Each structure stands twice: as C-alpha cells, then as structure tokens.
UniProtKB/Swiss-Prot annotation:
It is found in: Cell membrane; Membrane, Caveola. Keywords: Cell membrane, Disulfide bond, Glycoprotein, Membrane, Receptor, Transmembrane, Transmembrane helix. Residues 33-440 are extracellular. GO terms for cellular component: caveola; cell surface; lysosome. It comes from Bos taurus (Bovine). It comes from the Eukaryota. InterPro entries: CD36_fam. Pfam families: CD36. The chain crosses the membrane at residues 12-32, 441-461. Disulfide bonds join 251-384. PANTHER family: SCAVENGER RECEPTOR CLASS B MEMBER 1, SCAVENGER RECEPTOR CLASS B TYPE-1 SR-B1. This is Scavenger receptor class B member 1. Belongs to the CD36 family.
C-alpha cells in the first residue's frame, strides 16, 4: 500500500508540472510575438533610451567610398570630332566617417540633426595613389561654353580670349587628389570676381570638395515615439518640406527617410524610399529577393529600371526633364547649371546608344547595379552598395575655340560606390539580441508545450493501468471461485452415485 500511495503522489506531481509547462507554452505562443514586436518598436525609435540610438547617432559600420575615374585616351581626337575613348582607373578607396551633431528633439515628435562626413584615403585597399594623373573634361570650361551658346558672338570671343589667357583647355590633366578635393583655378577667381554668386564655391574646385568635413544639410525626421507610423520619415530638409529644383510637385517632394533606417516589419510588398541631397531628389528602391547576411535574414532592395528613365519611358519622371536619352538624369538645376547627368555606372540600365557612343564602357548588372540588404524585422541595413555615375554633356559651341569640333556626347567623368556592411562585435550583438534570442523563445514555447503534454499523459496512463490491474484481479478471482465450486460438485456426485471401489479407484487416479 505504501508503494502504491507513493507512485500516485509522483504521477500526480508529474501531471501538475506537465500542466504548468503546457499552460506556459500556450501563453508563450500567444504572447511572445507581441512581446517581440513591442521590444522592436521600443528599440528602433529615435530615443536616447532605445538600444539603437547610439548606432543611429554615430554609425558603427565602416563605410567606404570607392571612386573610379574615366581617363580620356584621345583628348585631342575628341576636339577634332573623334569618338571618345576612355579607360577606367581605380578604385581609389576612402574610409568614410559619419557622425551626427546638433541633435535637437522637437515638440512635434521630430528630431533635427546635422550629419558630418569626412574621408581618409586607404592606400592598401586602392588600386593607385592620389598622386595618379587623370585626363578628364574641364568641367568649368565646357560648362561655361554651354551656358554661352546662345549669347552674342562678341561675348563668346571675349570668353575664348579669357580661356586662352588663363591657359584653359577643353581637357585637363589633374591628380586624383586634385579632382576629388579641389584645385586652385584662376578661372574660378575670375568668375567670382565679375559674376558673384554664380558659383556655389569660392575657393578650390573639386568633385567631392563640398562633401569632406561638411554636413549634408539639416534633416528633421520623425522619431516614432508618439506616432510610430511615421518613424524615420523626413519631415523637412533645410527647413523645407519640398525642394524647387524640378518641374512638378511630385518630383520636388521630399519622401521617405534620410537613408539610414526604415520602418520595421517589412514585407516583400514594402519599398525603400529616401531623400538624397547629393542627387537633389527622393529615390525609391524595390524588393528583389530574400537572403541571409551573417546569419541574419535580409530583404534585398534594388533600383527599378525606371529610376533614371526619361519622361517618355516613365511619365512620372517628366518633372525631372529636360531629358536626353532614357537612363540618365539631368541634375544641372541643382549643380550650378552645369550640364551634369546622374546614372548607373557605365550607363547600365540606360539607352544602349549612350554606352555605344563612348569606347571603353561595359555595363553589366553584377558590377554596376546597386542594392541594400535590410533586416526586415527592424528596418536596419545590414549590407549596402550604392553605385552612381556622374557624366558631362559636351559638344562644340560655335564661337568658342576651345570646344573645337567636339561631337555631342554624354561623357562619363567618374563613378563611385558607397558601401558598408555590419561586422565584428556589432554584428554579433545584433545577431544575439534580434535573431538568436527570438529564435530560442520561438522553439522554447513549443518544447514546453510538447513536454507538458507528455508529462500530462503519465498520470493518465498510470490511472488506466491501475484500473486494468483491478479488473484482471477481479476476473481471475471470480474464475477461481467457479472452478472450486465445479470440483466440489463433481466430487459429491462421485461419492453418491458410484460404487465404493470405483470411488477408490477414481481417487487413486
């Protein structure tokens, strides 16, 4: 009896534990997704108390700017009317450092900030030195010539004489460092002296001179603390909610984020939209495929073929015109009226006539397409590669001798890649907190439920087995009683009806 009572207590305890496990598993199945969502919402918003705030304030991911220049092989031939020939030089790689300053939280659920960038040359990652010489179009001379195209002949003659006096030619031979960060040019001083405010710079002229040790404008974005539906969206840039560079309200709108984080809980139907001060416009990327980066699930977003399409191919882009061939965007209105164009490198995804007009271009998606890999649950970029090309439209301008017989062509100057990937301790922490722990909780809830069900079965089985034993004992006892009664009746029959000798013989038998 003691063993039986003890067994009952053990099975009852196991059943109680199983019930607790099962209930806990069910509660976790119901509650864990909601808890994870609340934690994500709490920690991706722009709040000094959130886990991602320091990452947003000073990006821990190493960014690199890789620059490729198109060296002009036949500058004199181009002036005489020949087809341009180019050779790609690079990459010249720079480490890009970013940090936010003047962070001000406003009363309308927004935060304002300036983001500063600085660059350091990385010789070990580069294919060449900043002292390398590159032959490229003289942007100042050719742009000024285009601006004078419809001016009186006397002004053109005066400009030709000024160019000659200052030693200016249609093509120049400068070092990579000068092209990137600026060089002294007497033409700049002359223009600023006689045509003040016509150029956005007063000193040296360089393609990236305005970006080094400077900010990209005052961004005001929504924090998501009070209204999560607008988290990271740009409210204003430099105090305005839309720009005035383009010819339609849609093209002038400042849409999306500042390009660093997006709203969490993305789906394949989501898109990535951001405002780029360098491109002077908002851009939208579209979902392509799922992937994995460092063990972290990602969504890859890429540029649609219509990103730089002209208005005849994609009517919503009509506001960015005047346009030339499809696949390049005229950015002259926000680049001191110089005939500059933005596109994918080597005119990838553009009208084929653009690449065919210049020898040495070989567009292909593997090398020249851009992408962003985003963790869909948090909206945080894991790996990105943004590639863009800057080109100059050049042609002969009658009356300006320096332009000679240059045939109309969109001539590529350079293309660059801004890339960054989460790595090291940052990647490990991100993986543990936002991938591993949710995965452990996900499996734990089902393990608890399964274990609870197994433990609940033990007392049930024990009870069934106990009832079976009682039944068998009762059956065997009842059967034994009937057998004894039959033997006794048979013996009495023999004693009363058979002769005595027979009984003795039967007994002996």
């Amino acid at each position: 009896m003691g063993n039986l009572s003890r067994a009952r207590r053990v099975t009852a305890a196991l059943g109680f534990i199983g019930l607790l496990f099962a209930v806990l598993g069910i509660i976790m199945i119901v509650m864990v997704p909601s808890i994870i969502k609340q934690q994500v919402l709490k920690n991706v918003r722009i709040d000094p108390n959130s886990l991602s705030f320091n990452m947003w304030k000073e990006i821990p991911v190493p960014f690199y700017l890789s620059v490729y220049f198109f060296n002009i092989v036949n500058p004199e031939g181009i002036i005489q009317g020949q087809k341009p020939q180019v050779q790609e030089h690079g990459p010249y790689v720079y480490r890009e450092f970013r940090h936010k300053s003047n962070i001000t939280f406003n009363n309308n659920d927004t935060v304002s900030f300036l983001e500063y960038r600085s660059y350091q040359f990385q010789p070990d990652k580069s294919r060449g030195q900043e002292s390398d010489y590159i032959v490229m179009p003289n942007i100042l001379v050719l742009s000024a010539s285009m601006m004078m195209e419809n001016r009186p002949g006397l002004l053109k003659l005066m400009m030709t004489l000024a160019f000659s006096t200052l030693g200016q030619r249609a093509f120049m031979n400068r070092t990579v460092g000068e092209i990137m960060w600026g060089y002294d040019d007497p033409l700049i001083h002359l223009i600023n002296q006689y045509f003040p405010n016509s150029l956005p710079f007063k000193g040296k002229f360089g393609l990236f001179a305005e970006l080094n040790n400077s900010d990209s404008g005052l961004f005001t974005v929504f924090t998501g603390v009070k209204n999560f539906s607008r988290i990271h969206l740009v409210d204003k840039w430099n105090g305005v909610s839309k720009v005035n560079y383009w010819h339609s309200d849609q093209c002038n709108m400042i849409n999306g984020t500042s390009g660093q984080m997006w709203a969490p809980f993305m789906t394949p139907e989501s898109s990535l939209e951001f405002y780029s001060p360098e491109a002077c416009r908002s851009m939208k990327l579209v979902y392509k495929e799922q992937g994995v980066f460092g063990g972290i699930p990602t969504f890859r977003f890429v540029a649609p073929s219509t990103l730089f399409a002209n208005g005849s191919v994609y009517p919503p882009n009509e506001g960015f015109c005047p346009c030339r061939e499809s696949g390049i965007q005229n950015v002259s209105t926000c680049r001191f009226n110089a005939p500059l164009f933005l596109s994918h490198p080597h005119f990838y995804n553009a009208d084929p006539v653009l690449a065919e007009a210049v020898s040495g271009l070989h567009p292909n998606p593997k090398e020249h397409s851009l992408f962003l890999d985003i963790h869909p649950v948090t909206g945080i970029p894991m790996n990105c590669s943004v590639k863009l090309q800057l080109s100059l439209f050049v042609k002969s301008v009658k009356g300006i001798g320096q332009t000679g017989n240059i045939q109309p062509v969109v001539l590529p100057l350079m293309w660059f890649e801004e890339s960054g990937a989460m790595e090291g301790e940052t990647l490990e922490t991100f993986y543990i907190q936002l991938v591993l722990m949710p995965k452990v909780l996900h499996y734990a809830q089902y393990v608890l439920l399964a274990l609870g069900c197994v433990l609940l079965l033990i007392p049930i089985i024990y009870q069934i087995r106990s009832q079976e034993k009682c039944y068998l004992f009762w059956i065997s006892f009842k059967k034994g009683s009937k057998d004894k009664e039959a033997v006794q009746a048979y013996s009495e029959f023999l004693m009363t009806s058979a002769p005595k000798g027979t009984v003795l013989q039967e007994a002996r038998l």
